[in-house]
């Protein structure tokens, strides 16, 4: 079989073997490469996190085993820029936590943001996540609603404002709305607290729908 995958994570298996988590045309998969951590092996460095690889492989015991690497695009080089590294890491973590199935439009979205030059990785990540929800058919309704007061309650089923639900700061919802609406969203300054709480509520919303 042949497939194209993004490398999301790799770990050492034993002393010299490599185990990597990939996302691509077969969904989210685990790859095993015997002696993959030996630098004299020809595939050493191929399965670096963030690289895009096209491989010929077979499946064994729930793992995919590469027969050959047909093509590799070393997106890991982009991670030398710390802001791009943060954005790629945020996206990889989201896919690792939540996405198991393959969707062509979703894969294209991930690649587009992986290749994006960013000056504001937190704002870019929120933009990615809101696009992710739209691609999956879960775009929250609060993005088109007027948010007032100091706090609001969010209905996780529809993502709309409600008299009950998850309590969220109105300023945070308005921040997400602004990022959703603006083309020049990278100009928006994201405080650490806003990023952490915004990420938490978006992941909670996505988890609610994926686990129904």
UniProtKB/Swiss-Prot annotation:
GO terms for cellular component: bacterial nucleoid. Transmembrane segments: none annotated. One of its GO terms (biological process) is DNA recombination. Disulfide bonds: none annotated. This is Uncharacterized protein aq_2203. It comes from Aquifex aeolicus (strain VF5).
């Amino acid at each position: 079989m042949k497939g194209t995958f993004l490398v999301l994570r790799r770990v050492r298996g034993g002393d010299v073997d490599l185990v990597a988590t990939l996302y691509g045309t077969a969904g989210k998969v685990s790859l095993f490469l015997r002696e993959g951590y030996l630098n004299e092996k020809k595939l050493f460095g191929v399965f670096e996190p963030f690289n895009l690889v096209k491989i010929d492989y077979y499946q064994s015991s729930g793992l995919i085993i590469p027969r050959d690497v047909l093509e590799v695009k070393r997106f890991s080089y982009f991670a030398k820029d710390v802001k791009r590294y943060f954005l790629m890491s945020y996206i990889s973590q989201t896919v690792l936590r939540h996405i198991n199935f393959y969707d062509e439009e979703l894969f294209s979205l991930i690649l587009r943001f992986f290749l994006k030059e960013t000056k504001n990785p937190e704002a870019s990540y929120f933009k990615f996540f809101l696009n992710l929800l739209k691609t999956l058919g879960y775009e929250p309704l609060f993005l088109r609603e007027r948010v007032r007061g100091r706090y609001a309650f969010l209905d996780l089923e529809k993502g709309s404002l409600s008299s009950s639900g998850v309590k969220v700061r109105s300023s945070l919802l308005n921040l997400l709305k602004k990022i959703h609406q603006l083309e020049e969203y990278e100009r928006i300054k994201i405080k650490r607290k806003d990023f952490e709480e915004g990420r938490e509520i978006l992941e909670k919303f996505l988890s609610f729908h994926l686990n129904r």
